[in-house]
């Protein structure tokens, strides 16, 4: 009887082992996806904590108002970037937005303000701009943490998040995927609206890959300016392809 019992237990162990191993790998594999810091390996999956990513990005994102006297005002989004050469004691935080958000304020004096969600607007200065690539640099009296810049180019299918002030709703979030990209533009499925312009497009690590810039009502995609476009007038870039500076290294 004891021998038969031992055989039965061994039989159960043989049956149970594959199921146990399967459960282990199902639990282990997703964890390994998120443990890889390189988006080129895991950039297709959402972050483990979307809530934490949203909160961290919101801390560095503001609404921008351009209100020239006697003219129609415009509204957009900006986000903090680390550009020490443009920061001052009075204006310690440097921001990136779109040129078209502030273009009517150029040469009009102190008519640009920014604000964190649901807080009062504060002064901002226009530092410089790149009209061709639709980028502008501001600085503000607010003290905000800078967002990191991604070390990796985007690929079709990558998970991305856009955060801004869609139609004036501050702190709006839109999730989506990269459809495709070229050297300076990224096509995404994220839903954006007027007011989202200038907002950061971040990967699943919370690092910026581009700036939300335009939308097409008749199409199912929207567009962002990639970090490569920053190399013209915004950032000092050390890489180059076909005679043009790039933020990402395409020769690796």
Model-derived regions: residue spans:
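Catalytic-histidine neighborhood of serine endopeptidases
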Residues: 30-38, 75, 82-132
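Catalytic nucleophile loop of clan PA
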Residues: 79, 191-212
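Active-site substrate-binding loop(s) of clan PA
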Residues: 44-45, 52-53, 79-80, 84-86, ...
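Flexible, gly/ser-rich surface segments that form the specificity/activation loops bordering the active-site cleft
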Residues: 104, 145-185, 189-196, 212-223
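C-terminal cap/linker of serine protease catalytic domains
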Residues: 28-54, 208-252
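A conserved glycine-rich beta-strand in the N-terminal activation segment of trypsin-fold
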Residues: 44-51, 61-96, 122-123, 173, ...
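N-terminal Sec-pathway targeting helices
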Residues: 2-17
